[in-house]
Amino acid sequence: MKKPLNSAEEKKTGDITKAEIEAIKSGLHSNPFQIIPLHETPEGFSARCFIPGAEEVSVLTLDGNFVGELKQIDPDGFFEGRIDLSKRQPVRYRACRDDAEWAVTDPYSFGPVLGPMDDYFVREGSICGYSTGWARIPLKLEGVEGFHFAVWAPNGRRVSVVGDFNNWDGRRHVMRFRKDTGIWEIFAPDVYACAYKFEILGANGELLPLKADPYARRGELRPKNASVTAPELTQKWEDQAHREHWAQVDQRRQPISIYEVHAGSWQRSEDGTFLSWDELEAQLIPYCTDMGFTHIEFLPITEHPYDPSWGYQTTGLYAPTARFGDPEGFARFVNGAHKVGIGVLLDWVPAHFPTDEHGLRWFDGTALYEHADPRQGFHPDWNTAIYNFGRIEVMSYLINNALYWAEKFHLDGLRVDAVASMLYLDYSRKEGEWIPNEYGGRENLESVRFLQKMNSLVYGTHPGVMTIAEESTSWPKVSQPVHEGGLGFGFKWNMGFMHDTLSYFSREPVHRKFHHQELTFGLLYAFTENFVLPLSHDEVVHGKGSLIAKMSGDDWQKFANLRSYYGFMWGYPGKKLLFMGQEFAQWSEWSEKGSLDWNLRQYPMHEGMRRLVRDLNLTYRSKAALHARDCEPDGFRWLVVDDHENSVFAWLRTAPGEKPVAVICNLTPVYRENYYVPLGVAGRWREILNTDAEIYGGSGKGNGGRVQAVDAGGEIGAMLVLPPLATIMLEPEN
């Protein structure tokens, strides 16, 4: 048993005790700033340092001037001595051992970066600028270039930044603790492009697994998982016109057609490796431009350790994944997209986080970012941890991340994942597995406040940026303003549309008359939210099959069904979203392990489908009636709603001052002639799109390009040819 130090054994070496030396050597000292920095005595300045492995140490100014030799006071690397300085300033140590020599800029000779005002803003929950106010960023301090590291770990006994620059030795860069906020900080020179993590001694003295930086702007390529020091972006942005356009318009009245992309499997290089951001810029952006999409939405491109998670289990919310290059590359991609008028959206995951040991879970030895009680802090569906939205530091971390992507990378919006799981305390839980809110209800009030604040700040500080909720329940006012009691999202995914329409089109046509309501019911709520119609990645994975595989009938009918479905969707009120590969009817289910089946485009039916999607986009964008009232009931009117027997649907899309567009769907393989549709406007109507056209792989049936609407007994209509399993669109010529 180690006996206590007596007064003789407690004697000081200079003004440092043996106990303090041993505490630093063993990694147990929590504040070396008290004893290691330069200190002033009546005789002048003295220096003290701990450099393991050194046998000799001399002291230099940052200009390289020699100011003194230090004496070894402990064989494990402690040195101390008088130096010739007239004022306090940062110094550099030159260490020697045998024939080796190396330099160490003393991190303890710098003052703090954060001050009382920073502490105040952190405590009161300031949002704007929080991430750049104390995140690890490059800066110049006291004339020296370096990085400011800071991390929130209020329950840690000792926190160090470790990395390539100090041989991952947690005794070398022990951070300064700011007790009012729980933040630890240190300024470290000579750490450019270095891998690093935080070494944390927990509240009970236990050494925790090394933690990646929650605010890191760059990470290592998996399977490595350290953070990497990164400079500020130097991108020269050329997207002012694009951003000004979206800031000035009502997004609800603009054409929005989103191409959903998994960056790692859209295309691969010949050797099977990922495309870089520059390669994606050169290939994906021109493809989307040609296809007529207005936006690219990426599945999460934030850093994540596990490819099959598709990015939805992220450990680095501030870092674009290293799979496709550095953050500058992603900035170039966004700039390139904006230059040709294409917006970039990011799937964003504030609902939960993975339990990888280098991540946020049990960050400082306590449940810091998550709830301690698994009834609140563990997600049974995904085996992940749930953020504690009631902690102001957690809320600030997430909200600043949303602002960060808009500010630093000029993103056009965030599609917020798994919103339903955030809103309900009993989501995927049985009785007894959840804790009611303060009023005894199942609503997660802390999450509601978080979402409202996030949306208010995004829209308030970045006009033109949109937020989209993936929300699958009937929670009211998801896309209504916060001041009207809503959650404040700009748009919401219409999961009901997706479910009902896929169910309908998978049925054999002979049975469809019994399920007519699957295509009409959605109009009862189509304008209660600002909807996006999503045919997303979720519908083509986990054994669900691709969209073409879901369609009923033989191969010809499958293609005809999918073409008519796309026509139905592009004519239906709501913004559009289509997952990659479905535009050319890929047969196989999507997998993140390889590229899409681009070879299918050599076959006419697949290439015809692609041409149809392109023409649908171009028609949707060029015809205001198809988009300007996507979210308002006065832009839609049924023409034929109850023809169950023939499975025919027709409606009129309108916009003020614009020509109306009639959408007619014949969803059986029966070719119909002289089918009457009440169009409401007399004169010639032009057929502007026909999904049965031969160029799309159809039979070529149609109306010869035009029909004549006449007044017959007070009702204006036309006798139409309805191609089999097809959607046509008509527009009056005058």
Swiss-Prot record:
GO molecular function: 1,4-alpha-glucan branching enzyme activity; cation binding; hydrolase activity, hydrolyzing O-glycosyl compounds
Recorded GO CC terms: cytosol
CDD domains xrefs: AmyAc_Glg_BE (cd11322), E_set_GBE_prok_N (cd02855)
Domain of life: Bacteria
EC number: 2.4.1.18
Family statement drawn from the similarity comment of this UniProt entry: Belongs to the glycosyl hydrolase 13 family. GlgB subfamily.
UniProt name for this protein: 1,4-alpha-glucan branching enzyme GlgB
Gene: glgB
